[in-house]
């Protein structure tokens, strides 16, 4: 009888300890997420950069491994892609090079279209542009007035978005490596998020499409300056091709594509 009582007391103690430890671990993980979100808020609060020409006076994350001929250069890239089950069907891409030495912004707007049934019908076009007085200007004549207006009105989310609002979602996971300063955010966003609303309106994306977001970059999470980062929005609707919007801001190196 005594041994039986001791067994149940030990079992109860183990259960209580497990509950306490689990609770402490849950609180620790929750506190870590709050701390990381606060750090990311400092980083994202440095946006929007409404005038891209202000980047002439802004230094980024310095890296001694970058090529010397790329020093003091910002690269801004965005792309809107329609992706089938296993292939890229359509992509519009803007890439700008912000040269801090010459105070010039140049780049190109590319369009790619792949026919799902006939690969030989794929098309690629590139339109060279520059930025003058914070406005996109063509360096060669464009015949299509609709395309011309579309490109001239192009804006990046770092110019017109509300990036800190991403952190308001309750369905996010944030990780940060203090050794490398690499961070990653991923999760879901509601249709009420202002960035989601803006992208759906701009690209005529179905209003009921679900949205996943991913943010990657390098930062000490202190918000001291603009850092390299990549932002992804994934829009999905049942029976529809996936739509992906990507945007990146990098310093001293050519943006990956």
Curated annotation (Swiss-Prot):
Gene3D superfamilies: 2.50.20.40. The chain crosses the membrane at residues 6-26. It is found in: Cell membrane. It holds the Pfam family DUF576. Coiled coil: none annotated. It is a single-pass membrane protein. It comes from the Bacteria. The keyword DNA-binding does not apply. GO terms for cellular component: plasma membrane. Keywords: Cell membrane, Membrane, Transmembrane, Transmembrane helix. NCBIfam families: SA_tandem_lipo. Belongs to the staphylococcal tandem lipoprotein family. This is Uncharacterized protein SAOUHSC_00172. It comes from Staphylococcus aureus (strain NCTC 8325 / PS 47).
């Amino acid at each position: 009888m005594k041994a039986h009582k001791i067994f149940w007391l030990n079992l109860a103690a183990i259960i209580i300890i497990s509950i306490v430890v689990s609770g402490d671990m849950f609180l620790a993980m929750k506190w870590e997420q709050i701390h990381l979100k606060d750090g990311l808020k400092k980083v994202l609060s440095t946006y929007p950069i409404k005038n891209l020409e202000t980047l002439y006076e802004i230094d980024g994350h310095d890296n001694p491994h970058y090529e010397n001929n790329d020093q003091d250069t910002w690269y801004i890239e965005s792309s809107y892609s329609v992706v089938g089950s296993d292939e890229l069907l359509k992509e519009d891409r803007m890439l700008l090079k912000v040269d801090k030495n010459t105070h010039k912004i140049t780049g190109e707007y590319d369009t790619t279209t792949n026919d799902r049934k006939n690969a030989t019908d794929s098309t690629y076009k590139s339109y060279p542009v520059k930025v003058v007085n914070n406005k996109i200007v063509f360096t060669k004549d464009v015949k299509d007035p609709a395309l011309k207006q579309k490109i001239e009105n192009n804006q990046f989310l770092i110019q017109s978005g509300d990036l800190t609002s991403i952190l308001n979602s309750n369905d996010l996971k944030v990780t940060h490596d203090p050794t490398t300063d690499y961070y990653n955010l991923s999760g879901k966003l509601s249709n009420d998020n202002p960035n989601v609303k803006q992208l759906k309106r701009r690209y005529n994306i179905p209003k009921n499409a679900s949205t996943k977001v991913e943010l990657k970059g390098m930062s000490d999470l202190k918000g001291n300056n603009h850092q390299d980062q990549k932002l992804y929005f994934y829009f999905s609707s049942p029976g529809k091709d996936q739509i992906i919007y990507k945007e990146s801001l990098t310093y001293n190196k050519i943006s990956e594509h």
